[in-house]
């Protein structure tokens, strides 16, 4: 459901390498997409551990080896961890896809808890806060958020004509609606020229948008807007002529 899937994957890897250090994590810079052979080695290792306490430990180790293309590390891991056969792996993947569809979501690589979805480390603070409020934290409600959102702080230094901020707003994107004023304010606070490069909504470019994706985007935007104190509520879908008139 992406107009440029290869470009999206490349940007995702670059973003991971840039964002990870701010959360105390790591991701290899310049990582390539893992080839099918390496993925085919990792899946059997994890399949039999889905309900095993070792899943997290083995998953992290396998993930690091996968993204680093470290065949030797996978060889050593395979000596310690039993592998599932191809049929068992296929059944596990199909079962996972059915469960995801039943819970009305459109993508893998997600966390799900009690009807709420979390798509990456930058959303985990929502899950942490929810668990703390429920009393599910061993440290009680005073527990610090492990993956809290870093503050949006432009600093005190003013732009010396070397920097510019380019924004690609989509008039149908709730994320654009939520973040536009903050983006303008950020640019103004340090005297950075803001250049707007509008983009046509994906569905108006022929990219399919399943209902589950739309539901997630709207609920995620509402969750994010509440967190930053941005106004977000009832709306009309501007697809079609309203978007064209807005751009004009």
Regions found by a protein language model. Give the residues of each.
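C-terminal cap of thioredoxin/glutaredoxin-like
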Residues: 61-156, 164, 179-186
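Short His-Asn-centered micro-motif
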Residues: 114, 169, 235-236
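Short, surface-exposed alpha-helical recognition segments that flank or form part
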Residues: 4-7, 84, 88, 171, ...
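Short, solvent-exposed loop/turn segments at secondary-structure junctions
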Residues: 35, 116-118, 124-125, 172, ...
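A short, structure-level motif marking secondary-structure boundaries and short turns
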Residues: 2, 81-82, 167-169, 205-207
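Structural alpha/beta surface segment adjacent to cysteine/selenocysteine redox centers
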Residues: 1-66, 179-248
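Local sequence-structure signature of Cys/Sec-based thiol-disulfide redox active-site neighborhoods
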Residues: 1, 159-182, 199-200
